[in-house]
Amino acid sequence: MSHVFISHVEEDQSLARRIAEYLEAQGYRAWYYERDSVPGVSYLIQTGEAIRRAVAVLLIVSPDAIGSY
């Protein structure tokens, strides 16, 4: 099933959760790593597949995200 992929840094995890909850309340499906990843499977494999299947990618660009680069 297609979804909105939410990209964020670890510090914005709670914001990603709130955005996912909002999107899902509006009838969309959301995917973010902390909730939807499968333990034991590579981060790169999981996120790559989730992005490939996404109908949209939402980037959370916060001060923490900018500071991480």
For the regions a protein language model found, what residue spans apply to each?
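Conserved TIR/SEFIR loop-to-helix hotspot centered on a Trp-containing motif
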Residues: 36, 63-69
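Conserved N-terminal substructure of TIR/SEFIR domains
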Residues: 1-60
